[in-house]
């Protein structure tokens, strides 16, 4: 789980004198998150200058996520974060060694939100599906933050818990050793890559999102039959394909692949009846 350029917004955040170290045309989903997933970042009231030592790493991450939700990547910088916290921007470095450390903490907060309320059950297929869906919904709820840090390996407590749950489901399926590690990495990378890709699209300015969405009713809808015969056959259906439908289709393909190769089929009542 790695990426390059994920900290570009923070790399520019030393502007204004702050000190310290340095898509595919799809419409936003109408799906809603499970009720047991934590909602948006908590808001802090009062912007007066804070007393030295009154800041905490948790508060800094919460306020960072609020700023990213409200103003996107363009609305997030260390000077703005300092003003929102009522503190000097350099105070951040008493809690985070670098901007990248803050980025990783934000990424771990997103995973924490996705994991809230998730309790693995006897059905390993459902555990895999729920975790992957939760990551996607959380990233869609916080697209700017997700696009900043979606592919990072945080090594934080939330990520460690998510990895433990995911590997546990893979072990339940009968995979062992190197094969279990490979299947886990494939599922984890699929989840973060897909959710991160959607987040990058949703983090764009609304007019750019609209320009991408309109392509399916523009160039593709009017594709020349002789030049693009395959596009022409499905041109009327392409604009109606939703984000949710695309995701659920690829998720089912991925999970079915894991099921087909699993040494130990799921024995929960739902899948036992289906397999029988």
State where each predicted segment sits:
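Hydrophobic alpha-helical connector segments
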Residues: 116-161, 177-180, 184
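C-terminal peripheral helix-coil segments that are non-catalytic and often amphipathic
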Residues: 1-44, 200-276
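Hydrophobic alpha-helical bundle segments that form small-molecule/ligand-binding pockets
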Residues: 162-190, 194-217, 239, 258-262
């Amino acid at each position: 789980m790695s990426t390059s350029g994920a900290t570009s917004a923070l790399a520019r955040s030393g502007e204004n004198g702050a000190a310290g170290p340095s898509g595919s045309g799809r419409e936003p989903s109408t799906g809603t998150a499970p009720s047991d997933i934590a909602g948006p970042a908590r808001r802090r009231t009062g912007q007066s200058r804070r007393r030295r030592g009154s800041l905490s790493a948790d508060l800094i991450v919460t306020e960072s996520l609020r700023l990213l939700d409200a103003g996107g990547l363009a609305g997030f910088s260390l000077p703005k974060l300092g003003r929102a916290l009522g503190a000097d921007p350099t105070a951040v470095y008493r809690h985070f060694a670098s901007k990248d450390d803050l980025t990783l903490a934000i990424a771990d907060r997103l995973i924490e939100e996705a994991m809230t309320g998730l309790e693995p059950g006897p059905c390993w297929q459902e555990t895999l599906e729920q975790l992957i869906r939760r990551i996607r919904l959380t990233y869609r709820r916080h697209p700017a933050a997700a696009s900043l840090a979606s592919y990072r390996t945080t090594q934080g407590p939330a990520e460690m818990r998510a990895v433990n749950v995911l590997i546990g489901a893979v072990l339940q399926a009968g995979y062992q050793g190197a094969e279990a590690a490979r299947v886990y990495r494939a599922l984890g990378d699929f989840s973060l890559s897909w959710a991160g890709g959607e987040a990058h699209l949703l983090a764009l300015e609304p007019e750019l999102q609209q320009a991408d969405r309109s392509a399916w009713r523009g160039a593709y809808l009017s594709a020349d039959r002789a030049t693009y015969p395959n596009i022409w056959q499905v041109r009327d259906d392409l604009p109606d394909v939703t984000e949710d439908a695309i995701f659920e289709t690829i998720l089912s393909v991925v999970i079915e692949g894991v099921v087909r190769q699993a040494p130990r089929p799921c024995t929960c009542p739902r899948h036992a009846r289906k397999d029988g």
